[in-house]
Amino acid sequence: MSSWVEVSLNTPAQLSLPLYLPDDETFASFWPGDNASLLAALQNVLRQEHSGYIYLWAREGAGRSHLLHAACAELSQRGDAVGYVPLDKRTWFVPEVLDGMEHLSLVCIDNIECVAGDELWEMAIFDLYNRILESGKTRLLITGDRPPRQLNLGLPDLASRLDWGQIYKLQPLSDEDKLQALQLRARLRGFELPEDVGRFLLKRLDREMRTLFMTLDQLDHASITAQRKLTIPFVKEILKL
């Protein structure tokens, strides 16, 4: 399921960026593992009335988009205007979509590595960063797959700007934390994931969390359809293991 938010931007072209955000990716559904300090810093920035900047980096699938979705959801529920820009989908829009975003309460730029070397996008992000600094009110969250200085950006001033503020590496979850994350996800969806079934999934499947969550959703649907509890034999049958 997805929630839908439309942000109208103050640009000459009256651009509008529709945001399709998963409604189950909130702070309540995020298992922090060794990322408690990162999570606390992020939530502290969201509570501030003035601007703040955090850069999160991790490999794909570690949960960085989840945290940006959660931040957008939290401020949206408070009635604040937010902007989420997934740069891995940059072909859907143009750099001018960032114009006017300094007037929002929160701007989230996801997967900045996807525009490394793109002069137009790099300049647009740099200009937005400077406008946010001047406004003093907008919170800015940016994610990438590596630290700012390793992004191979063509604009040195942007690399310098990204290196300011708080920079965190999103630590990967241990297997025990992945089990806890799966069980939390199940509880939030209204069912229980037995520990032995969870450990079986971790042993037999790709341990990337996105894959595990998709499999859990598949098993939930199959369990409801078949009116059967989640057991290892049932999981083997559904997943053909």
Swiss-Prot record:
The lineage of its organism: Bacteria, Pseudomonadati, Pseudomonadota, Gammaproteobacteria, Enterobacterales. It holds the Pfam family Hda_lid. This is DnaA regulatory inactivator Hda. Mediates the interaction of DNA replication initiator protein DnaA with DNA polymerase subunit beta sliding clamp (dnaN). Stimulates hydrolysis of ATP-DnaA to ADP-DnaA, rendering DnaA inactive for reinitiation, a process called regulatory inhibition of DnaA or RIDA. InterPro entries: Chromosome_initiator_DnaA-like, DnaA_dom, Hda, Hda_Enterobact, Hda_lid, P-loop_NTPase. Belongs to the DnaA family. HdA subfamily. The active form seems to be an ADP-bound monomer. Forms the RIDA complex (regulatory inactivation of DnaA) of ATP-DnaA, ADP-Hda and the DNA-loaded beta sliding clamp (dnaN). SUPFAM superfamilies: P-loop containing nucleoside triphosphate hydrolases (SSF52540). Keywords: DNA replication, DNA replication inhibitor. GO terms for biological process: DNA replication; DNA replication initiation; negative regulation of DNA-templated DNA replication initiation. It comes from the Bacteria. HAMAP family: Hda.
